[in-house]
Amino acid sequence: MKKPLDELCARLDVTFSDQRLLWQALTHRSFLNERVDERLSLFSNERLEFLGDAIVNFLATTLVFERFPDAGEGYLTAWRAALIRTETLASFARRYDLGSHTLLARGEESSGARQRPSLLADTFEAVVAAIFIDQGLDAVRKFLLPLFEETLATLQEQGLPVDYKSKLQARIQAERGITPRYRMIERSGPEHQPEFTFEALAGDESLGTGRGASKQAAEQDAARDALDRLGGRD
């Protein structure tokens, strides 16, 4: 552990009744693979991440539903997606320096995993679940809603990130009655800085390809390319 949990609790402004929950939230599964002697006393954060994902989605959904009372489903979905995307949750994790506190295997450590957006987002969701189990939903609201509110304010100034996947899906469903799918073509680059190449398809027809530092980003880029080729990007 790089830093004491008391420091992290101060950053989070949360006092845990059962600090073992926070330990679990910060324990990546790779750490247990190298610490056979500690497996009886530690569990990975995967179960907490599962619960935290649902809580984050619920609170984001509730917030945008209440904030935009006249908005339709598509508009609400776009706002929620912006709040819960990997990059947004990873930025929250960086704010609390969760990467420095995460328990990782040596191999993951050397690959730069502490700052990997997907790992940071997963860890943040696990911490949310730990707060929920220890303190209840009101404590999670107190912790999470200010982060969401700040993000909403920024997005209202700068505009929503364009969701090309939703745009492509709406068009393909309307024109062809099917849902586009995405297939990974290549994964390249070092472990700590990968680049993914994805293809967007309608049935077996290739619509476009895209690259990105995460699978989600590559899929968005593939959808953008597909819309460009179809002549449908705004």
UniProtKB/Swiss-Prot annotation:
Residues 163-232 form the DRBM domain. It catalyses: Endonucleolytic cleavage to 5'-phosphomonoester. Mg(2+) binds at E49, D122, E125. Keywords: Cytoplasm, Endonuclease, Hydrolase, Magnesium, Metal-binding, mRNA processing, Nuclease, RNA-binding, rRNA processing, rRNA-binding, tRNA processing. One of its GO terms (cellular component) is cytoplasm. Its main location: cytoplasm. Its EC number is 3.1.26.3. One of its GO terms (molecular function) is double-stranded RNA binding. Transmembrane segments: none annotated. Disulfide bonds: none annotated. Its cofactor is Mg(2+). InterPro entries: dsRBD_dom (IPR014720), RNase_III (IPR011907), RNase_III_dom (IPR000999), RNase_III_sf (IPR036389). SMART domains: DSRM, RIBOc. GO terms for biological process: mRNA processing; regulation of gene expression; rRNA processing; tRNA processing. Coiled coil: none annotated. Residues 221-234 have a biased composition (Basic and acidic residues). Residues 5-136 form the RNase III domain. Residues 189-234 are annotated as: Disordered. It is an enzyme of class 3 (hydrolase). Homodimer. Digests double-stranded RNA. Involved in the processing of primary rRNA transcript to yield the immediate precursors to the large and small rRNAs (23S and 16S). Processes some mRNAs, and tRNAs when they are encoded in the rRNA operon. Processes pre-crRNA and tracrRNA of type II CRISPR loci if present in the organism. Belongs to the ribonuclease III family. This is Ribonuclease 3. It comes from Roseiflexus castenholzii (strain DSM 13941 / HLO8). The gene is rnc.
